């Protein structure tokens, strides 16, 4: 900084505070005397020196500085120098999340050192200013989250640029012409950084790795979403070649070593567009009157050897990714859709949990075994639902079909087996909720797309009894497998296993939920045992079911819940009310399930406990990849939402407020469930304050209020596909009306002048 800027008479306290913060942050280990500070910052006048001393004293009170002597200070490193993850936001509200904490700390752009979203950084706290939020300053970028980025190319004569969303880079990436790889303006491209910025205003330099194609093409846009999150949009040829060499033949040795379930009624029940069938159910009546139910899971670990090229690719991916119009599988297509998939009328290898259940669905005994099965029928959820309802089931009531009689036999192919499975599943479900499981039945947005991937309709999809039938038996199998390894005699250490864990809700977020639902006339307990909290949540879900605010309350309630994740350190699963729970039932699309299969086999053969540290690292990786896959899925939904509304500009719709922020209102259209934002700048009738605690905006002058859940009328104002952003405007009776100020009379003008004089007089005192 120049002398004039640092030592000039016009420098105020805020400016000098910022200069001192930066000065100490750049010299973390040094003790600095007043003399050195004044000389380095060119503070030549007595008032500036005195102001600097006062500021440093305040910084010491804030623990930003440590006082070494009467005339020297140093940065308080023991308190201030920390590490964490940087979070970049498009609106400029960047933050850093310290390691081991959840609450973000604001970082202004000038203090970010050009850190990118997800980068690991070293940072220091800035001294708090009066009435100012806690701030941090990035001092060092420890590790970049990634080095490849997706954007739109702009190719000029001498240089090219990659235009990226503002939440990725503050500046575009410069690409030398020789590194463009034939890309043209408006091509979507993947670019690798070859030179990182070393200053706030310097753009990064990159090279094109892959040209995805022209923007706007459906395949290009979906692949862009995958590439943006570092997810693979191509399957490596060498991995596919390895998969093509795997034989799907079942050998005589396989038949000898496995239980044979080929003659027992078995079926798969899946979504209508499913191709990878990784679970099947079998059922038969035992001589003692009980039911034998088999939960049969594709035996992926039989075909995918640990450490093989296919396994390494599966570890890297960790999960299949489900975008609106496509699935990006964890395993090569030959394995996931053919060899491993439990296709009808084909003999398949499975890993099975075989239960003996009485008529109350109580487990009398079980065994976990390798099997050979042959599915008799591939059912779609809709087909099973139709069969259940044709035999007297009323969806959502929890009641099974009436008993079969000679006069009223069950209708439909395999009706007895499917209705019995449904009846047992409903008993299991009732017992689970009685035990304290939390009931969330939030609807999911789905799109129907044409052959070009363009959305033609969108709708909410709700889980029905047919879905719940399958879900309950999968939950039972997962819990049973976890108990078989984790539940040991007191004093004995269980062998290593990846668990699916879910911690208790955050008490503070539960209190926020309580305050929110009170406005709709509901109550919730935030204190007491886990069971009491769960029962209270379930009552809330039951009370608001079918009401306009149902989805909204479910959304806010979900925010109060902790995220489920994988870990070898078991703490139970709050949402399901299980002490032991794992993922065993989907090895085609989830890598943790494959890990569990391998460990079960190892332990069944008398193997020693697996390396805990190694499996915990794998669990963390799988949890991270699950979150990344969910983010990509959400982005594909946002893109299709904007695309669907793109030809409806200017049209008006009824909507409900689904989110309130300091920068605008989120609204969901009642008719098609598409969500957009009404920017704060467009609500022009007043200046609105954001009341975070009460989820509302309140006008300062006219006291108009916009509350979460309010019914409003909106107009589609803008549909920006590149940003995946829908902008709405308030319309009809909801539109803001700017109230004109009454003309000021002469006397009122005098009063105004008099008040201004009084204010100026007070200011000058």
Describe the residue ranges of each PLM region.
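Acidic, low-complexity intrinsically disordered tails
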Residues: 1-14, 687-696, 731-765
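A short macromolecule-binding patch
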Residues: 103-108, 169-175, 673-690
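Short, surface-exposed secondary-structure boundary micro-motifs
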Residues: 126, 194, 658, 717-719
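Internal insertion modules embedded within essential enzymes
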Residues: 151, 201, 717-731
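Intrinsically disordered, low-complexity linker and terminal regions at domain boundaries
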Residues: 119, 679-722, 726, 738-743, ...
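Electropositive polyanion-binding surfaces
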Residues: 39, 190, 195-197, 214, ...
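Residue-level marker of beta-strand positions
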Residues: 64, 120, 188, 362, ...
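Charge-lined substrate channels and their catalytic hotspots, especially those that engage the 3′ end
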Residues: 2-294, 301-347, 378, 385-386, ...
């Amino acid at each position: 900084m120049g002398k004039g800027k640092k030592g000039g008479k016009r420098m105020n306290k805020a400016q000098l505070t910022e200069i001192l913060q930066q000065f100490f942050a750049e010299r973390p280990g040094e003790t600095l005397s007043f003399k050195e500070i004044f000389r380095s910052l060119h503070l030549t006048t007595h008032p500036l020196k005195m102001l600097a001393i006062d500021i440093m004293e305040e910084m010491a009170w804030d623990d930003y500085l440590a006082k070494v002597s009467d005339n020297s200070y140093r940065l308080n490193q023991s308190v201030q120098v920390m590490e964490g993850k940087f979070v970049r936001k498009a609106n400029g509200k960047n933050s850093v999340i310290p390691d081991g904490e959840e609450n973000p700390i604001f970082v202004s752009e000038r203090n970010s050192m050009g850190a990118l979203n997800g980068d690991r950084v070293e940072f220091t706290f800035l001294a708090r200013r009066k009435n100012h939020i806690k701030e941090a300053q990035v001092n060092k970028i420890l590790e970049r989250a990634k080095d490849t980025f997706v954007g739109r190319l702009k190719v000029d004569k001498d240089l090219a640029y990659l235009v990226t969303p503002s939440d990725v880079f503050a500046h575009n990436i410069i690409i030398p012409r020789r590194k463009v790889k034939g890309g043209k303006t408006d091509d979507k491209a993947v670019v690798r950084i070859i030179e990182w910025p070393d200053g706030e205003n310097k753009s990064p330099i990159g090279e094109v790795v892959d040209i995805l194609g022209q923007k706007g093409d459906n395949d290009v846009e979906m692949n862009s979403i995958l590439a943006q999150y570092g997810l693979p949009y191509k399957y490596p040829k060498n991995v596919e070649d390895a998969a093509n060499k795997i034989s799907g033949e079942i050998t005589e040795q396989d038949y000898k070593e496995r239980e044979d379930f080929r003659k027992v009624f078995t079926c798969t029940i899946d979504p209508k567009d499913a191709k990878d069938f990784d679970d099947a159910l079998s059922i038969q009546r035992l001589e003692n009157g009980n039911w034998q139910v088999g939960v049969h899971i594709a035996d992926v670990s039989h075909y995918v050897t640990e450490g093989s090229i296919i396994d390494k690719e599966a570890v890297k991916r960790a999960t299949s990714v489900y975008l609106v119009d496509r699935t990006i599988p964890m395993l090569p297509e030959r394995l996931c859709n053919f060899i491993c998939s439990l296709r009808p009328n084909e003999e398949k290898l499975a890993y099975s949990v075989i239960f003996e259940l009485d008529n109350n669905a109580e487990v009398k005994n079980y065994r976990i075994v390798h099997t050979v099965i042959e599915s008799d029928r591939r059912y779609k959820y809709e087909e099973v639902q139709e069969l259940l309802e044709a035999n007297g089931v009323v969806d959502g009531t929890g009641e099974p079909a009436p008993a079969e009689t000679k006069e009223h036999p069950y209708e439909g192919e395999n009706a007895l087996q499917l209705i019995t499975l449904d009846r047992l599943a409903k008993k299991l479900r009732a017992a689970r909720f009685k035990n304290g499981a939390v009931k969330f039945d939030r609807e999911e947005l789905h799109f129907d797309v044409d052959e070009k991937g363009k959305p033609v309709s969108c709708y909410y999809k709700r889980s029905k009894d047919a879905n719940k039938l399958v879900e309950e038996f999968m939950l039972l199998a997962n819990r049973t497998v976890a108990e078989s390894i984790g539940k040991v005699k007191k004093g004995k250490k269980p062998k290593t296993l990846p668990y699916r864990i879910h911690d208790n809700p955050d008490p503070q977020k539960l209190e926020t939920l309580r305050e929110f639902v009170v406005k709709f006339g509901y109550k919730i307990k935030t204190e007491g045992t886990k069971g009491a909290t769960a029962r209270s949540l379930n009552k809330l879900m039951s009370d608001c079911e079918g009401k306009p605010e149902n989805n909204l309350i479910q959304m806010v309630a979900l925010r109060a819940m902790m995220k489920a994740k994988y870990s070898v350190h078991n703490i139970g699963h709050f949402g399901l009310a299980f002490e032991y729970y794992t993922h065993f039932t989907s090895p085609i699309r989830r890598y943790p399930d494959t890990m569990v299969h391998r460990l079960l086999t190892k332990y069944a053969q008398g193997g020693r406990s697996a390396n805990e540290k190694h499996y915990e690292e794998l669990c963390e990786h799988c949890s991270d990849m699950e979150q990344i896959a969910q983010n990509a899925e959400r982005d594909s939904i946002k893109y299709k939402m904007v695309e669907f509304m793109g030809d409806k500009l200017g049209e008006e719709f009824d909507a409900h407020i689904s989110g309130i922020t300091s920068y605008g209102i989120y609204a969901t259209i009642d008719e098609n469930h598409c969500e957009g934002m009404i920017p704060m700048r467009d609500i022009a009738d007043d200046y609105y304050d954001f009341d975070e605690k009460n989820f509302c905006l309140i006008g300062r002058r006219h006291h108009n209020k916009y509350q979460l859940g309010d019914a409003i009328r909106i107009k589609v104002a803008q549909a920006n596909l590149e940003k995946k952003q829908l902008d709405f405007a308030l319309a009809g009776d909801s539109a803001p009306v700017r109230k004109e100020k009454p003309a000021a009379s002469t006397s009122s003008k005098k009063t105004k002048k008099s008040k201004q004089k009084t204010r100026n007089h007070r200011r000058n005192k």
